Regions:
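The feature marks non-catalytic terminal segments
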Residues: 86-181
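Active-site beta-strand->loop->alpha-helix modules in alpha/beta enzyme cores, enriched
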Residues: 1-87, 163-165
Length: 181
């Protein structure tokens, strides 16, 4: 499955026009309870130290869905931010609004996307980033996500493209820190 997911990701990035991307070493297809290879932590640290991003957007400690690999990614990104983030850089954790949870989560229960206690919920007024994709931006996002056929085909069958657009239009992040210095 790893080769399939890699091909899908590359297609998705092509749709978005992303020309710079780095793959981490280690397995790319693990089950929901499996940890990622810890070598990834050092790789993320090296990338943050080299790139010195203004902002890092990642999963929160709950992994958004409760999937262990997502929680590992959060830990790695947070540790890299703390160790090598440039002064003034911001760290953001993915979250959902109460409105999203009320409207969308009941519709996706059958897909086991969210484990108990997830997704995290943050009131819209407390978000650090609150972006709602519309029009051409939403169309581009959907085209990019539809390239991930192995992960999204069931949702697309149930919701159709318009319903999927509602499910995926919000990008919500809570402020998780600012690098001092």
């Amino acid at each position: 499955m790893g080769a399939v997911r890699t091909k899908e990701l590359l297609r998705s990035l092509e749709i978005l026009g992303v020309t710079e991307h780095r793959f981490l070493d280690g397995p790319v297809d693990v089950d929901m309870d499996a940890h990622l290879d810890e070598a990834g932590a050092a790789q993320v640290l090296a990338i943050v130290a080299e790139v010195q991003p203004d902002s890092i957007l990642t999963f929160g400690p709950d992994g958004m869905t409760g999937h262990q690999a997502h929680m590992d990614v959060c830990r790695w990104a947070t540790e890299a931010f703390e160790a090598a983030g440039k002064p003034g850089a911001r760290l953001y954790y993915a979250t959902q609004t109460p409105e999203f949870v009320a409207e969308v989560v009941p519709q996706v229960v059958q897909f086991n996307i969210f484990r108990p206690g997830t997704p995290p919920v943050t009131p819209r007024a407390e978000l650090g980033i609150d972006f709602v994709a519309e029009g051409e931006v939403l169309d581009l996002k959907l085209a990019s996500l539809e390239a991930h056929e192995s992960q999204i085909e069931g949702l697309l069958e149930v919701f159709g493209e318009q319903g999927l657009g509602r499910f995926l239009r919000d990008e919500s992040f809570r402020d998780a820190g600012r690098k001092e210095g």
